Amino acid sequence: MTNLRQLVQFAKTEPARIFFISLLAITLSTADQSLFSYAIPGLLEEFEIDLNIIGYMLSASFFVASFAVVFVGMLSDYIGRRLVLVTLLGLSALFVGLHAFADTLLVLTILRVSGFALGAGLYLVASTMVVETAPQKYRGLVAGTLQIGYPFGFAIASLIVVPLIDTYGWRSIFLPAFIVLLISPLIAYVLPESSTFKNLQQTSGDENAKGLSDSLRELLSDHKPHLFICFAGSFLISLAIGGTTYFL
């Protein structure tokens, strides 16, 4: 009962608001990004390509995203989590929505790569905000619960796709992404900045003056085993999800 009361009290706090809004952002972004997988049969037919070309497009998306998330992480340390998260949500939704109007395979590839890279960065920032503001006792719980947004986003996308794609074709399924673009200013209004980031901004010189090379050196020297274990786990999970989502 004590733990239950503590959870109820937590639900009324600013960290809880950050958690629920971040969960919404991840769900919406995942729904947007997953639309591409449903469009693949239509793409193969309209552009008269085989699955190898789709594989190259997806590989390019993941490759660019792997570098984009590093840049996004650095950017969020300098200008704030809130601004970066909302900007990524809006821009990724815009690029996904524009899939509906792509008239060439090159344009479609550029939109896919750009939208996916921005969406990948959003997951990073949302997770960071939630973990660094959650009470230490419940960080594992809220971090795990946040992952609900990924399968839930896919579920929402499937409900949207089924009635649209049969009637209006593959292009129509990307149009709901513009709704997410319209929602992003509202999310910006209600989402508070991470208190941890605000506290870091108030600290003096030495910490804030660290460059990228200094930060990476410190990370590799102090947290190398954890870093590589987490990287390997993330890599293998992404390998499995990517293969089963897009090619089975």
Which residues does each predicted region cover?
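Residue-level signature of mid-helix packing/kink "hotspots" within the transmembrane helices
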Residues: 34, 62-70, 155
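Extracytoplasmic gate region of multi-pass secondary transporters
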Residues: 36-37, 224-248
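Helix-breaking motifs and short loop linkers at transmembrane-helix boundaries and internal kinks
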Residues: 48, 80, 101-107, 118, ...
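Paired small-residue
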Residues: 95, 106-114
